[in-house]
A protein has these predicted regions:
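Surface-exposed molecular-recognition determinants
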Residues: 1-184
Length: 184
């Protein structure tokens, strides 16, 4: 029985249901030293605004303020056989989809799995920035199916204890779940 091995599995911590929400944040109530890594699963998201872009913001003071500078690199492809966006940039958020924004017509939406590695600096690497990897799928405003792989990082070495999912405009509905991974 692999359950006896312990460690390494993801534990469901919370699912929030967004209903015309501007953001969903996971605070230090859930981002604790009990878990090393965290995963956010964004499911069945529908945006109020056509052309919204999904983003992650991180806080070092439990959401009193959010960091305003990040680095990211991404590669995305559309079902129209075109590159959605490739490149890297400094940004005010970690945008977790390619340059093609999310459509909100019938049948269109956004889904993503975001893994955040050791945000509380428990690995003995206190001078390391918090990094994430996001794999996102959405329909753009032209109804192209788009897939994007994004790597993002803070520009500070401080522990992150609050992580927020949002769009750059409008509100959204859907499910946003948080999971934690223990190492033992």
């Amino acid at each position: 029985d692999f359950a006896d091995a312990g460690g390494g599995q993801w534990t469901h911590l919370l699912t929030s249901t967004a209903s015309s929400s501007s953001s969903i944040a996971f605070s230090s109530t859930y981002i604790t030293t009990t878990y090393l890594d965290y995963m956010i699963v964004v499911s069945g998201i529908k945006t109020s605004d056509n052309g919204a872009t999904a983003a992650i913001h991180m806080s070092t003071d439990n959401g009193s303020s959010y960091l305003s500078a990040y680095r990211e690199t991404r590669m995305g492809y559309k079902s129209s056989d075109a590159t959605a966006n490739a490149g890297n940039q400094s940004a005010s958020a970690i945008y977790i989809q390619g340059g093609a924004a999310t459509g909100n017509s019938a049948g269109q939406g956004f889904d993503s799995v975001i893994t955040i590695f050791d945000p509380l600096k428990q690995s003995g690497t206190t001078d390391k920035r918090t990094v994430l990897n996001a794999f996102s799928v959405h329909h753009d405003t032209s109804a192209n199916l788009t897939t994007t792989n994004v790597a993002g990082a803070t520009k500070v070495n401080t522990a992150v204890n609050n992580i927020k999912f949002s769009f750059d405009t409008g509100t959204f509905t859907g499910k946003v779940s948080l999971y934690g991974r223990k190492i033992s």
